[in-house]
Structures are given as structure tokens and as C-alpha cells.
Amino acid sequence: MSLISPPYKWKALPSTYWRAFESFKTKIGYSKFYTDWIYNKSIKRIKYSNQKLQLSILHRLQLLEPILGDKLNSTDFEIHLTQNEEKKIAKKFDLTVEGNKKPIMIAAMGSGKNKTYPIEYLAQLIEMAFETTNAPMILNYMPKQKMEINRLIKMLKPKTKKAIQNGLTPNSLRDYIVTVSQCQAVIGNEGGAINIAKGLSKPTFAIFSPIIDPYGWHTEVKNKTMAVHLVDYFPEIIDFKDKIKKIDQIKTLYLKLEPKLFKQKWIGFLKELK
């Protein structure tokens, strides 16, 4: 029997995990100088990716190689809906969205303040998106973020506000998945919302938090999976090893990533949507 060590910090693992750990013949984990003696299959993480999957996923797949071998050659992932879900969401869109244009999903808020692009900047990007596509917009956010969303909407022009489809705001993870299946793209804060869209084969444009190393989480494919990070414009001020310093300066760093820096890339992506 084999056991794969979770890709988390050791301190977070309960003592019951370690008691069970001893009974496994094959123990697989990432190679570290202080844990190599525990595993009989130590995995050295690759540093560069020549595939379209980002490093964060490839590192986890590496843990399965001793068990599955070359069965991992196909690393694409897909999210599927039931026929009933497809029918229900299609009917909901027909009743809610005017015209025949598919909406654009906006990942309006990150999981926390450290992963949320300043809303005054996001408002500018939403305006650009509407001016470029004239498409309906859906805002994705958690209920606790409603006040910030209200602030965001107040910053928008009347025509853009009207394009916001409040009746289609997702109210659960599964609801988000089925809603995105009917959208033409997902744009905004990098995170789970963007990654789910990739699993549905939707074009995405992600704005990374300055504290996240994009190389581990993103693979650029023009007009398909695109992203921006402060390091693209100010590499001299970004040190991914000094995360504590970046967290302390998160607001200042975010404000440096002005929409004008990537306006051309943003609009170019939107113009290619179908």
C-alpha cells in the first residue's frame, strides 16, 4: 500500500496522520533535506514547465508518478455539467439576458484584501470591457463582500451599471460553475474563479496579487489564458522570497499596477472574444 504525503506544511498535520503513516510500505513526498529519510520515494520538484499546465499543478501530479507512471501524459482537466444543469442554466439565461450576447463573468473580488485588485482600478477595467464588447456583465463575489461590490458599482457609468446582470450572480460554487458555462470569458482577480473557467475551456484574463508568484500558477496562451502581474512592469521591486515584506506593502504595490500599464493587452484580449 502507498501513501502520498499532502503538499502542505508539516505543522498542519495531526498526530493521527503520523501514526497511520508508519504502516505504509511506500511513502511518497517532496524531497527536502529534513524529510528525505522518511520517504522511500522522494520527489524533486521540477523548476520549469514545458507544458501548458502551471507548476503548481505539475508539482502535485509529480507525487502520483511513482504510482501511475506514464498514465499522466494527458494533463488537461475538464469540468462537466449534467444535462439537467445545462438545460436549467440555458433557460435561466434566456429569461434574464436580453439579446444574443453571452455575458462576461467578472472575478470582482479575491479571497481576501491581499488578493483583490483595487476596486477603483477594476471599475476602469470594467468600463473598458463594456465599451469594447457591449456585453452583459456578471459580478462574482462572496456575500460578505457585498459592501465593496456596492462601492464598485457606484463607480460605474449608468450604461455599464445597466449591463450588470444581478439576477445571475452565483450563490454557490456549483452555481458559479454552471453560470460560467454560459459565459464567453472570465476576467478579473486571479484565483479559484479563474481556474474553474479554465476547466470549462473559457478564455480568462487574470490579475495577480503582487504577493503571488505567477510562474507557479499561470501559463500564458494568447487570447486564451492571459494574465498580468506587477513583476511584468516593475521586476526590480518584486522579490518573491520576501513574502512578509510584500504583505506589508501590498496596498502600495497594488496601486503601482495601474490599468494604463496593460490597457492594450486587456482590450486586445476582449476584442478576440466571440
Give names to the regions the model predicted.
Residues 1-274:
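Catalytic machinery of carbohydrate-active enzymes
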